Amino acid sequence: MRAFLLTLLAATLTAVTATAQEWAQVTTPTAGPTQSIGFYTAGCLQGAQALPLDGPGYEAIRVSRNRYWGQPVTIDFITTLSEKVRAAGQAPLYIGDIGQPRGGPAPSGHASHQIGLDADIWFERQPGPRLAPAQRENPRLRSLVRADDGGIDDSVFTQQHATLLRLAAEMPHLDRIFVNKWIKQRLCQTVTGNRAWLRKLVVWIGHDEHFHVRLYCPPGNPQCQPQAGYYADDGCGEPLDLWFTRPPVTMPPPDAPRQPYRPKLPAACAAVLTAP
């Protein structure tokens, strides 16, 4: 019994402190019912579901990363939004990272996307034929923000981008959408009529080439930790102004040395990482 307990403890500690690279090396999901365990930036995913790489109104990109796994509610969100976008006469969406087969920290690109309830959707579209597999790894992905970070790039931004964000913000199960400060500002300045959906747009650094949807913890996932609320109104006042008055937040260059990302995960993630 003592040997068994020591083995179990060792496995638990390994999973809880495992590096992002160790999570990325697991290429398949676990069996069993889908469960989001932990928080968006420190958790894992049991029983993940794969997004089909092609569907009506969308195609997945950068699929070699193997980050097209998520909660069923996330997969349904993407496919339903894509159908709405297609019905609105827009070109198919590029779907980026959702999560790894068992969630957990990723070795590049994200601190979140760990419990299957986050997804990146790119502002760039492909109005023509679907991309060949090789093209999906590095498609053109233009920013909606000027290169000098001085405002919206009006040669790229169109009303279709505003419509896309509104359609996403009005979807059920959506907690928030992370967007760049300039995008939020433009919409705050131009949207008329029903502005309630603007509340869902939460400013964060980057997010000028894509927007990041985050869904609520689904019912029946008791180990999923919800995120605190945000704006009481549309978020177009002081919360937005602060992004333009406080010192700018800068990201390190892509080639900067990085410490292995090792968030403290829930103990239950041990079984997720080590399951067959």
Where are these regions (language model features)?
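Bacterial N-terminal signal peptides
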Residues: 6-15
